[in-house]
Amino acid sequence: MNRLIVSTCLGLAFLGLHLDSHAGRYALMPDQVIDGVQETAQVDVAVLVEDARIASLVAKSDIPAGYERIDLQGMTLMPGMINAHEHPLLYDDNYQTAHLTASSAYKALLGLAVMQRWLAHGWTTIRVMGDGDVFYGNQDLQRVFSEGVFVGPRITGAAHYISITGGGGDINYGSPEQTLIADGLIADGPIEIRKAIRTEIKYGSDWIKLLVTGAFHSVGDDPRNVAFSPDELAEAVAEAARHNVPVAAHAHATEGI
């Protein structure tokens, strides 16, 4: 069963790339279709595609003339999957040092390969929840995908985490004499939080990510502690709302959640 699912996702993903680059009319004929609406998979159904977009589902016996028939025997068609929490540019397990050892361009190129691999496995939408990048590599990838320069999944999300000084998005392992650039945006107080959110939106983030508590993999903070004050959180949500941008929160422990 696992082999069937993997083969199906791979086959359909690459089929999708083919159809996307060859506008026309196709009738996809799998063994069954999961449409996300019916409670059970549908059999004897074809998916009609026009100009790289799904037009309708019809019985295989009712496929209109003029459609190129593509036999997908042994496969199941289903909607693309959504990964709602991902960090595509974290190429190293130690996310607190990875951004110091590679450029934003290098990580974007690695992210391109990663996202194309995810697309081939059936993930058609990726929500980025901050990443190990001091610039905006994911937003650049989103741009080249939307412009058709490269084929990749849809990207939404936040370029960075917004963290307090000493929080989960800060670098807390250096001595006071060292100046290290954090991969998060460090903001303290309503004014700095407002500016950080405006900066994120300016450069393409369509979500805001707040590190409301400490994290497990960062040095010098505690996942049980709430980082932002109520006033800071209220300002963050209000500022994002002014731009019609949703807010996501990293939160551990009862009080943080």
What are these regions (language model features)?
Residues 81, 143-169:
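Glycine-rich, aromatic-flanked loop segments that form ligand/cofactor-binding clefts
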Residues 112-137, 152-161, 205-218, 246:
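Divalent metal-dependent hydrolysis catalytic cores, especially in the metallo-beta-lactamase
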Residues 24-26, 33, 37-78:
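Histidine-rich, glycine-flanked metal-binding segment
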Residues 140, 191-257:
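Histidine/acidic residue-rich metal-binding segments in metalloenzymes
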Residues 75-143, 147, 231, 255:
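Metal-associated gating/positioning segment near the N- to mid-region
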Residues 97-109, 175-195, 246-251:
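Active-site mouth loops of central-metabolism enzymes
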Residues 1-8:
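Bacterial N-terminal signal peptides that target proteins for export
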